């Protein structure tokens, strides 16, 4: 165990984590030069296209240090996006140290701070690494000063590297070996292994990534999953080098994969403890807290026959994505589908994209909403993730919305714009800290305002320089109402939204105008109305397409023309009673683009 080093690479989006991981793999000989490609650990095509990391990936490499000893490096490349911060905390639970990568040209950003605090809270040794020093705009001294001022850790011995050109990567490896402590032995010698991640493989069944804290796992041993109480027989164990490599056993302190032919998707929950069935450990390891989804949306198949396929696809995805929640839902407008819970908008986009690509499904998604707490008049509190399920207003005492604490890091010149944006979003300022050339602004904001487009607007008012990190704080009561959309007098449940009373009229008006452009013209007038309860707050009409019935009347009496027009009107009226309006997918997403 003395020569094992477990560490994660943490950083803000785009500061060069995956590129640094590539260089470390190359230097330790994990892959030959011809097998190397950029971001070799981002295996999913969506990750490669967007240039972001979504899943944390682990690699085990041998490294012969300058002191002549061979060390085993187990490292995990983590995502940088705020939606996937739970992936980072899970990865850190399996490590003793972390490399904090900071872009020397951009300086410290919000996620660098948030991830670093997570690492320090878990008692990890943090080694700062300044990346991109080959850029002409890189300023190593400023970046060091910012790390000390903003994060508050000593950056005197920060390693300055360029992951792109491979400069000084050997110094990073030496720093890992000498500064990150080896795994500590536990007080018990019985097997304890923490499940960091699980995914579904079509040939092997469920494969789990584990960190063995104590004891060892061998093929043929019978293991017990402590939370479910089920036992399984281990088929194979091994490590990723990044290729999957089988080993005769995984010992204490190591990070590797195990395959126990678990067929059930929920058989190996993330954060659970594995132990030997014949000689179990006295207690489970402290896992990590379950991530609660914050954003909910309905996903419906375009073709109703795809419903069973959608269920199977979501089941497989959930194994790979511990934060995804879903339950069946039926909607009058859309038929059968699922109400899904996500961590944020990026998470939602990626799940929908994966379902459409990997499982060939055509999906319609409804506008995302957050979870509200509803206090009913009989004193019960319910959590409501679907506006259509809001009880009748006479049964509701108060509605509470989720509030988040947002930390924004920005260069000084954009403060005015950012404060204005936060005020528009009903924010309450908590504090402003000046840290060198950067400013840290703290606000409490309603989550519903942040979820939809706050991130995009923040980037545009600060020319892309501001960065955001947020976490949930509490629920607050407020004057909320549900705005329903009626099309030709029929309520469309998938378009209902909950808004603050002060914004209700404006949102209703904007929604009707937006829908008017998106619903195709019919042979009869289509009335689009926004209503709060029985009170109509706005209306717009999609005019009917009509034939010019007077075209063949040349001159003649006016009563002849009137008769023809009346006859046409009667026909349209009859048609309106039986006609149904098809609502296109764009209309369901109109709610998203209302402020644009």
Curated annotation (Swiss-Prot):
<comment type="similarity">
    <text>Belongs to the TRAFAC class translation factor GTPase superfamily. Classic translation factor GTPase family. LepA subfamily.</text>
</comment>
<dbReference type="InterPro" id="IPR004161">
    <property type="entry name" value="EFTu-like_2"/>
</dbReference>
<dbReference type="InterPro" id="IPR000795">
    <property type="entry name" value="T_Tr_GTP-bd_dom"/>
</dbReference>
<dbReference type="GO" id="GO:0043022">
    <property type="term" value="F:ribosome binding"/>
</dbReference>
<feature type="domain" description="tr-type G">
    <location>
        <begin position="2"/>
        <end position="184"/>
    </location>
</feature>
<dbReference type="InterPro" id="IPR013842">
    <property type="entry name" value="LepA_CTD"/>
</dbReference>
<protein>
    <recommendedName>
        <fullName>Elongation factor 4</fullName>
        <ecNumber>3.6.5.n1</ecNumber>
    </recommendedName>
</protein>
<dbReference type="Pfam" id="PF00679">
    <property type="entry name" value="EFG_C"/>
</dbReference>
<dbReference type="InterPro" id="IPR027417">
    <property type="entry name" value="P-loop_NTPase"/>
</dbReference>
<dbReference type="InterPro" id="IPR005225">
    <property type="entry name" value="Small_GTP-bd"/>
</dbReference>
<dbReference type="InterPro" id="IPR038363">
    <property type="entry name" value="LepA_C_sf"/>
</dbReference>
<comment type="function">
    <text>Required for accurate and efficient protein synthesis under certain stress conditions. May act as a fidelity factor of the translation reaction, by catalyzing a one-codon backward translocation of tRNAs on improperly translocated ribosomes. Back-translocation proceeds from a post-translocation (POST) complex to a pre-translocation (PRE) complex, thus giving elongation factor G a second chance to translocate the tRNAs correctly. Binds to ribosomes in a GTP-dependent manner.</text>
</comment>
<dbReference type="GO" id="GO:0005525">
    <property type="term" value="F:GTP binding"/>
</dbReference>
<dbReference type="GO" id="GO:0097216">
    <property type="term" value="F:guanosine tetraphosphate binding"/>
</dbReference>
<dbReference type="GO" id="GO:0045727">
    <property type="term" value="P:positive regulation of translation"/>
</dbReference>
<keyword id="KW-0342">GTP-binding</keyword>
<feature type="binding site">
    <location>
        <begin position="14"/>
        <end position="19"/>
    </location>
    <ligand>
        <name>GTP</name>
    </ligand>
</feature>
<keyword id="KW-0547">Nucleotide-binding</keyword>
<dbReference type="InterPro" id="IPR000640">
    <property type="entry name" value="EFG_V-like"/>
</dbReference>
<dbReference type="GO" id="GO:0003746">
    <property type="term" value="F:translation elongation factor activity"/>
</dbReference>
<dbReference type="Pfam" id="PF03144">
    <property type="entry name" value="GTP_EFTU_D2"/>
</dbReference>
<dbReference type="InterPro" id="IPR035647">
    <property type="entry name" value="EFG_III/V"/>
</dbReference>
<keyword id="KW-0648">Protein biosynthesis</keyword>
<keyword id="KW-0997">Cell inner membrane</keyword>
<dbReference type="InterPro" id="IPR006297">
    <property type="entry name" value="EF-4"/>
</dbReference>
<feature type="binding site">
    <location>
        <begin position="131"/>
        <end position="134"/>
    </location>
    <ligand>
        <name>GTP</name>
    </ligand>
</feature>
<dbReference type="GO" id="GO:0005886">
    <property type="term" value="C:plasma membrane"/>
</dbReference>
<dbReference type="Pfam" id="PF00009">
    <property type="entry name" value="GTP_EFTU"/>
</dbReference>
<dbReference type="InterPro" id="IPR031157">
    <property type="entry name" value="G_TR_CS"/>
</dbReference>
<keyword id="KW-1003">Cell membrane</keyword>
<keyword id="KW-0472">Membrane</keyword>
<dbReference type="Pfam" id="PF06421">
    <property type="entry name" value="LepA_C"/>
</dbReference>
<dbReference type="InterPro" id="IPR035654">
    <property type="entry name" value="LepA_IV"/>
</dbReference>
<keyword id="KW-0378">Hydrolase</keyword>
<dbReference type="GO" id="GO:0003924">
    <property type="term" value="F:GTPase activity"/>
</dbReference>
């Amino acid at each position: 165990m003395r020569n094992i080093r477990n560490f994660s690479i943490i950083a803000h989006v785009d500061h060069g984590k995956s590129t640094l991981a590539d260089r470390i793999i190359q230097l330790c000989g994990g892959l030959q030069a011809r097998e190397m490609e950029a971001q070799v650990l981002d295996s999913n095509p969506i990750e490669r296209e967007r240039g972001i990391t979504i899943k944390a990936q682990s690699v085990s490499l041998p490294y012969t240090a300058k002191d002549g000893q061979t060390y085993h490096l187990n490292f995990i490349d983590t995502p940088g996006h705020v939606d996937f911060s739970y992936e980072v905390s899970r990865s850190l639970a399996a490590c003793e140290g972390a490399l904090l990568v900071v872009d020397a040209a951009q300086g410290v950003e919000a996620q660098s701070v948030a991830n670093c605090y997570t690492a320090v809270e878990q008692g990890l040794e943090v080694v700062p690494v300044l990346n991109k020093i080959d850029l002409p705009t890189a300023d190593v001294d400023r970046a060091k000063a910012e790390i000390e001022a903003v994060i508050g850790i000593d950056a005197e011995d920060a390693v300055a590297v360029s992951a792109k050109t491979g400069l000084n990567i050997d110094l990073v490896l030496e720093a890992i070996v000498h500064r990150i402590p080896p795994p500590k032995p536990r007080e018990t010698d019985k097997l304890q292994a923490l499940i960091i991640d699980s995914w579904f493989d079509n040939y092997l069944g469920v494969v789990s990534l584990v960190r063995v804290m104590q004891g060892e796992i061998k093929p043929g041993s019978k293991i017990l999953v402590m939370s479910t109480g089920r036992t399984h027989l281990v088929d194979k164990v091994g490590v990723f080098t990044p290729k999957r490599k089988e080993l005769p056993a995984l010992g204490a302190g190591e990070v590797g994969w195990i395959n126990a032919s678990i067929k059930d998707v929920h058989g190996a929950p993330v954060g659970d403890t594995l132990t030997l069935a014949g000689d179990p450990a006295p207690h489970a390891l402290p896992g990590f807290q379950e991530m609660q989804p914050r954003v909910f949306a309905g996903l419906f198949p375009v073709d109703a026959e795809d419903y069973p396929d959608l269920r199977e696809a979501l089941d497989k995805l959930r194994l790979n994505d511990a934060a995804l929640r879903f339950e069946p839902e039926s909607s009058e407008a859309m038929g059968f589908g699922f109400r899904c819970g996500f961590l944020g908008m990026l998470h939602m986009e990626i799940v929908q994209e994966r379902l459409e690509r990997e499982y060939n499904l055509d999906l319609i998604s409804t506008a995302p909403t957050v979870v509200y707490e509803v206090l009913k008049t009989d004193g019960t509190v319910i959590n409501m993730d679907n506006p259509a399920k809001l009880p009748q207003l006479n049964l509701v005492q108060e509605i509470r919305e989720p509030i988040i604490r947002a930390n924004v890091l920005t260069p000084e010149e954009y403060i005015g714009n950012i404060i204005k944006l936060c005020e528009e979003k009903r924010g309450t300022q908590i504090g402003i800290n000046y840290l060198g050339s950067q400013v840290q602004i703290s606000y409490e904001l309603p989550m519903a305002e942040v979820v939809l487009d706050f991130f995009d607007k923040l980037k545009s008012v600060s020319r892309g320089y501001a960065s955001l990190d947020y976490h949930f704080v509490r629920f607050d009561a407020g004057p909320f109402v549900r705005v329903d959309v009626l099309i030709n007098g029929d309520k469309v449940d998938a378009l209902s939204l909950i808004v603050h009373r002060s914004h209700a009229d404006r949102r209703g008006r904007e929604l009707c105008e937006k829908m008017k452009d998106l619903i195709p013209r019919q042979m009869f007038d289509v009335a689009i109305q926004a209503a709060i309860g029985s009170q109509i707050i706005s209306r717009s009409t999609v005019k009917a397409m009509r034939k010019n019935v007077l075209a063949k009347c040349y001159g003649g009496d006016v009563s002849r023309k009137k008769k023809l027009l009346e006859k046409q009107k009667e026909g349209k009226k009859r048609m309106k009673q039986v006609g149904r309006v098809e609502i296109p997918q764009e209309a369901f997403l109109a709610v998203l683009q209302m402020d644009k």
